[in-house]
């Protein structure tokens, strides 16, 4: 996750916005998912060349952890597929404005096998939740190959899309100020956003019935709804209270629980010293 955030910041705010530079940077993600893998000069095509070994250190920590992953062979192909899609998204969404949209939507049309709207599919590729969940289960080799496949199909694109649409939803004003791409801007109206979010939730809930700990994965979506919508950044977005209420109702009482507790937490953070 630290690698993901660090590379996103480099792409967002760096001086070099070439495709080959972004791809070279994201080889760190590939190497991090390869136990006993190589490390290389991830800054090869960038102006900035020296981070004091920081990125290589992060890669090494991930590689060392994955050596202990007993079920790695079963999840390797899924990890690299998710990583490839994540990398492609990061590359295309950070290109120059005059070529960004064309390359991004061409890529989406080639990869999207789920009949999802372009922006929804693109959003789903931007989450790393599937990678984390696969590794978490398979550190002790807990799942069969069939169960691994079912878990992958639950998270991509449905849980991941649900996650990132909420993330983009609360970041709209921040992204607008920074000139960053935000997939929520591509919805025609609030209703279209709600419909997309509900569809992802509905599909994921169905697929969760076919995986181990299905109720846990649904609970994660309920938690995401409550936690994201309670974020103080929501106040900066121009939308109706009715939409907020309608979105929260997707997760029913469970999301309300997380929402109310997160609101209390944020209030305490802003009012208590230290």
Regions found by a protein language model. Name each.
Residues 3, 24-173, 218, 228-233:
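All-alpha helical catalytic cores of prenyl diphosphate-utilizing isoprenoid enzymes
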């Amino acid at each position: 996750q630290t690698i993901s955030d660090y590379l996103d910041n480099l792409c967002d705010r760096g001086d070099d916005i070439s495709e080959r530079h972004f791809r070279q940077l994201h080889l760190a993600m590939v190497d991090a998912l390869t136990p006993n893998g190589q490390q290389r000069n991830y800054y090869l095509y960038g102006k900035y060349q020296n981070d004091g070994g920081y990125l290589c250190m992060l890669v090494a920590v991930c590689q060392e952890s994955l050596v202990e992953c007993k079920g790695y062979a079963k999840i390797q192909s899924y990890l690299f597929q998710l990583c490839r899609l994540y990398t492609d998204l990061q590359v295309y969404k950070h290109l120059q404005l005059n070529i960004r949209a064309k390359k991004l939507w061409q890529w989406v049309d080639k990869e999207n096998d789920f009949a999802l709207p372009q922006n929804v599919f693109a959003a789903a590729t931007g989450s790393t939740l599937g990678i984390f969940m696969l590794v978490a289960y398979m550190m002790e080799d807990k799942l069969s190959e069939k169960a691994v496949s079912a878990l992958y199909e639950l998270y991509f694109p449905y849980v991941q899309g649900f996650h990132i649409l909420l993330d983009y939803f609360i970041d709209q004003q921040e992204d607008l100020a920074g000139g960053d791409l935000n997939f929520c801007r591509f919805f025609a109206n609030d209703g279209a956003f709600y419909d997309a979010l509900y569809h992802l939730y509905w599909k994921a809930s169905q697929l969760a019935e076919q995986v181990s700990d299905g109720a846990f994965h649904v609970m994660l979506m309920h938690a995401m709804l409550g936690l994201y919508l309670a974020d103080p950044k929501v106040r900066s977005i121009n939308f109706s209270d009715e939409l907020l209420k309608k979105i929260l109702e997707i997760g029913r009482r469970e999301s309300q629980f997380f929402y109310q507790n997160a609101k209390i937490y944020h209030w305490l953070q802003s009012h208590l010293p230290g």
